[in-house]
C-alpha cells in the first residue's frame, strides 16, 4: 500500500484528514455535503438553449427608399452659400505654407494654419510648461532651418501667429474625451431598436449536470477547508525564541512548514476523492495524478490566502508569512519570489470558490502526468471540467472575453513553478534537511 495514501501525521488524531483512503471516508464526505448551501441557484433558473455560442452570419441589406422625381420649380431659387460651422478649419489640400516656419502646412492647428512639426512643438511646449532661452537676443528669423536651432523664438512665433494654449488638451483630457465619446456611441447603439434580420442572442448557460457538479465541488472544498483548518492548529508552532538564528529555531520553522504541507496534501487527497470520475480511475492512475499535481494545487490554495496589502500569506488564523519568513524556514529566493508573484497575479483575477474549485479539478485531471495509464479517460474527465468552467465564466464575466484564457494560462504558469519546486527540494537535500516520509514519497525524494 502506498505510504502517502495512509501515512499518519504526528499530533493529529486518527479521525482527521490523515485517514485518506478508508472505505467509509467517501460516504462520510458525501453525507457532509447534503446540507451545504447552494450558491448557484440563480443560474439554474436561466433560460436554456441548445447551443453554447451563437454563430454570426451576414445581415440582410435594409430596404432602400425610392427616390421620387422632383417637380421643376415655378420660380428661380436663390442659392445662398452655407456658413461654415465653428471649429477648426478643414485640412488643407493645396500648397499652403505654415504661418510659423514656412514649411508646407497640413491644416489649422490650435487656430493657426501650420505644419505638423510646429503643431507638435507647440503642444509639447504647452504640456511641459517649457521655458526656452534664445542665445541671439530673441530676434531669430524663423524658417525650416532656424526652427530647430532656437526654440524660444519658435514658440514666440507660434503665439504671434495666433496659436492658443487653451486649445491644447492634456493626455488626461484626451483620454476622458475619448472615453466619453465611446460611452456616447455605446449608449446610442443600445438605444437603437434591434434589426429584424439580427439573429436572437443565445445566452450562455450551465446544464443541470454542470450546475450539480459545481455545487458538489464547492461543498467538498468547503468541507475539506474546515477539516484541514482544525489540523493546522496542531502543527509545530512558529518559534518565538530570543535567538531567531539558533539551530533550534531554524529546525522548528522547517518543521512548521513541512507539517503545514502535510495537512495541505491531506486536504488535496480528500478533495480529489470527491471529484466526479476520480474514484472510477484505477488506483495507480489516482496515485500518479495526485503525486504530480499536489504541488500545483498547493500553490493554487496558497494564492487564495495572499494578502496584497501586506504582501503576505495567511495559513493560520491571525498569523501571516512574508517572504522573509519563508526564507527563514529554509526556502530559496528562487522559489519564494515566484510563489508571491503567482499569488499576486491570481489575486488580481478575483476568482470565487467555484472558479478555484474548477481550476483545481482541471489541474488534477492532466493526462500528460508521468505514469498515467488511461490517458484517454483522464482527458475526457478534464474536458468535462474545462467545459463547465467555460460556461461558468461566460455567465459571471460576460464582458471579459479574456477571463477564461487568462485562467487557463495560470495552469501553464503552475507547470513552471512545479519545476522550480523540484529544484528547491533538491536544494533542501543539500542542506541536510530531511523531509517527512509522506512528502518524500510525493516528491520522489530518495534518501
UniProtKB/Swiss-Prot annotation:
Its main location: nucleus. GO terms for molecular function: cholesterol binding; chromatin DNA binding; DNA binding; DNA-binding transcription activator activity, RNA polymerase II-specific; DNA-binding transcription factor activity, RNA polymerase II-specific; nuclear receptor activity; RNA polymerase II cis-regulatory region sequence-specific DNA binding; sterol response element binding. Induction: By 9-cis retinoic acid (9CRA). Residues 209-447 form the NR LBD domain. CDD domains: NR_DBD_LXR (cd07160), NR_LBD_LXR (cd06954). It is found in: Nucleus; Cytoplasm. Residues 24-37 have a biased composition (Low complexity). Visceral organs specific expression. Strong expression was found in liver, kidney and intestine followed by spleen and to a lesser extent the adrenals. Residues 1-96 are annotated as: Transactivation AF-1. InterPro entries: Liver_X_rcpt (IPR023257), NHR-like_dom_sf (IPR035500), Nucl_hrmn_rcpt_lig-bd (IPR000536), Nuclear_hormone_rcpt_NR1 (IPR050234), Nuclear_hrmn_rcpt (IPR001723), Znf_hrmn_rcpt (IPR001628), Znf_NHR/GATA (IPR013088). Nuclear receptor that exhibits a ligand-dependent transcriptional activation activity. Interaction with retinoic acid receptor (RXR) shifts RXR from its role as a silent DNA-binding partner to an active ligand-binding subunit in mediating retinoid responses through target genes defined by LXRES. LXRES are DR4-type response elements characterized by direct repeats of two similar hexanuclotide half-sites spaced by four nucleotides. Plays an important role in the regulation of cholesterol homeostasis, regulating cholesterol uptake through MYLIP-dependent ubiquitination of LDLR, VLDLR and LRP8. This is Oxysterols receptor LXR-alpha. It comes from Homo sapiens (Human).
Amino acid at each position: 500500500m502506498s505510504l502517502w495514501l495512509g501515512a499518519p501525521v504526528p499530533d493529529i488524531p486518527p479521525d482527521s484528514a490523515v485517514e485518506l483512503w478508508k472505505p467509509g471516508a467517501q460516504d462520510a464526505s458525501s453525507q457532509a455535503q447534503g446540507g451545504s448551501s447552494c450558491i448557484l441557484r440563480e443560474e439554474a433558473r436561466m433560460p436554456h438553449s441548445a447551443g453554447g455560442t451563437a454563430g454570426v452570419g451576414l445581415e440582410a441589406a435594409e430596404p432602400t427608399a425610392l427616390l421620387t422625381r422632383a417637380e421643376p420649380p415655378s420660380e428661380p431659387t436663390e442659392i445662398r452659400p452655407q456658413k461654415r460651422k465653428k471649429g477648426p478649419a478643414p485640412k488643407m489640400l493645396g500648397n499652403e505654407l505654415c504661418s510659423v516656419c514656412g514649411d508646407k502646412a497640413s491644416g489649422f492647428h490650435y487656430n493657426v494654419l501650420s505644419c505638423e512639426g510646429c503643431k507638435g512643438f507647440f503642444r509639447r511646449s504647452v504640456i511641459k510648461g517649457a521655458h526656452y532661452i534664445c542665445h541671439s537676443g530673441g530676434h531669430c528669423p524663423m524658417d525650416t532651418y532656424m526652427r530647430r536651432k532656437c526654440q524660444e523664438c519658435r514658440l514666440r512665433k507660434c503665439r504671434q501667429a495666433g496659436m492658443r494654449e487653451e486649445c491644447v488638451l492634456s493626455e488626461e483630457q484626451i483620454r476622458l474625451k475619448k472615453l466619453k465619446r465611446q460611452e456616447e456611441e455605446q449608449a446610442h447603439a443600445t438605444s437603437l431598436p434591434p434589426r429584424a434580420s439580427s439573429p436572437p442572442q443565445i445566452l450562455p448557460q450551465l446544464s443541470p449536470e454542470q450546475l450539480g457538479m459545481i455545487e458538489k465541488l464547492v461543498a467538498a472544498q468547503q468541507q475539506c477547508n474546515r477539516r484541514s483548518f482544525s489540523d493546522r492548529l496542531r502543527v509545530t508552532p512558529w518559534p518565538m525564541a530570543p535567538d531567531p538564528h539558533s539551530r533550534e529555531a531554524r529546525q522548528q520553522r522547517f518543521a512548521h512548514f513541512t507539517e503545514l504541507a502535510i495537512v495541505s496534501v491531506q486536504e488535496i487527497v480528500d478533495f480529489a476523492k470527491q471529484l466526479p470520475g476520480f474514484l472510477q480511475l484505477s488506483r495507480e492512475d489516482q496515485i500518479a495524478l495526485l503525486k504530480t499535481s499536489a504541488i500545483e494545487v498547493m500553490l493554487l490554495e496558497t494564492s487564495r490566502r495572499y494578502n496584497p496589502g501586506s504582501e503576505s500569506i495567511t495559513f493560520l488564523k491571525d498569523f501571516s508569512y512574508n517572504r522573509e519568513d519563508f526564507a527563514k524556514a529554509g526556502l530559496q529566493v528562487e522559489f519564494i519570489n515566484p510563489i508571491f508573484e503567482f499569488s499576486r497575479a491570481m489575486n488580481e483575477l478575483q476568482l470565487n470558490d467555484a472558479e478555484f474549485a474548477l481550476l483545481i479539478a482541471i489541474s488534477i485531471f492532466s493526462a500528460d502526468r508521468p505514469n498515467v495509464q488511461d490517458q484517454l479517460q483522464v482527458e475526457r474527465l478534464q474536458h468535462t471540467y474545462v467545459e463547465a468552467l467555460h460556461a461558468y465564466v461566460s455567465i459571471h464575466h460576460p464582458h471579459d472575453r479574456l477571463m477564461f484564457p487568462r485562467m487557463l494560462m495560470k495552469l501553464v504558469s503552475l507547470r513552471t513553478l512545479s519545476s522550480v519546486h523540484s529544484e528547491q527540494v533538491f536544494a533542501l537535500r543539500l542542506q541536510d534537511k530531511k523531509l517527512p516520509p509522506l512528502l518524500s514519497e510525493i516528491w520522489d525524494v530518495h534518501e
